[in-house]
């Protein structure tokens, strides 16, 4: 099987606005990939899959480059003073865990950023991870009822984001807002079979079975999310950043659901989208520096 992995989540590939990335620094540019265990990365109906059963071959890095004439490069170098500053999006990750029966949980994230723009939260059944007979990346709602982000006791959003476990209209709308897609008519969303309101997919509260879940919730933190010229996320440098979650067995519209609190031991994956500055000064060290 041939697989293509677009490097869309790496800072050099997510400059804002889109810019070419200088490849003439005095230090080598390296791409490091860490592979998961085979039992986590793959799903199989038969147990016993080992890393040695998987072979990866024909690996190549394909990228687009522009080579400038020496005179043009000299003009650009003169205009910039030999210093190239680029603003980029970058993802950071934190993890936590909740045990079955939990009704409230607070996770300290340690996110450090001058402009934290978005936070996304997912729950995975811990027993699924590393089990080739289960979907390791299956996401469940875990009976989540509401959540907020606390930065030095300031709450984002000001009102908790509610999860009703039935239609999840607020979760879906906030997810689209965080993706800058709620008002974008060029983005399509599926609300029909296997879509957002399908109980056995997006709304599944217990993803320990063979049917994978797709629940994901996110919060937009930028004041001017529609502009690529204004960086208006929240400042979390030297701040205590915590995720506050509540779980219960009654949805916010009063409809009872089948399971009390968190149904399984779950692993939380929290992703933060932040803005970083990458700087290359060819008149000094000639190596890249990253500022958060």
Regions found by a protein language model. Give the residues of each.
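Flexible assembly/topogenesis modules
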Residues: 1-292
């Amino acid at each position: 099987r041939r697989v293509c992995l677009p490097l869309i989540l790496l800072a050099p590939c997510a400059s804002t606005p889109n810019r070419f990335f200088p490849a003439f620094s005095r230090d080598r540019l390296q791409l490091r990939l860490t592979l998961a265990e085979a039992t986590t990365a793959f799903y199989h109906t038969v147990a016993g899959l080992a890393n040695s059963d998987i072979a990866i071959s024909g690996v190549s890095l394909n990228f687009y480059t522009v080579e400038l004439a020496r005179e043009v490069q000299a003009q650009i170098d003169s205009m910039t003073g030999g210093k190239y500053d680029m603003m980029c999006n970058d993802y950071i990750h934190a993890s936590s865990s909740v045990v079955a029966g939990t009704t409230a949980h607070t996770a300290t994230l340690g996110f450090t950023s001058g402009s934290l723009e978005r936070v996304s939260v997912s729950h995975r059944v811990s027993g699924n991870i590393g089990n080739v007979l289960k979907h390791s990346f299956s996401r469940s709602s875990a009976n989540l009822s509401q959540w907020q982000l606390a930065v030095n006791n300031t709450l984002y959003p000001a009102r908790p984001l509610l999860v009703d476990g039935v239609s999840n209209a607020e979760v879906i709308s906030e997810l689209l807002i965080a993706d800058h897609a709620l008002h974008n008519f060029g983005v399509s969303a599926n609300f029909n079979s296997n879509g957002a309101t399908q109980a056995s997919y997006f709304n599944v509260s217990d993803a320990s079975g063979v049917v994978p879940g797709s629940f994901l919730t996110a919060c937009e933190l930028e004041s001017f999310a529609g502009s690529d010229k204004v960086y208006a996320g929240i400042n979390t440098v030297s701040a205590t950043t915590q995720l506050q979650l509540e779980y219960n067995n009654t949805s916010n519209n009063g409809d009872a659901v089948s399971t009390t609190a968190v149904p399984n031991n779950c692993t939380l994956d929290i992703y933060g989208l932040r803005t970083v500055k990458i700087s290359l000064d060819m008149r000094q060290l000639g190596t890249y520096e990253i500022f958060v």
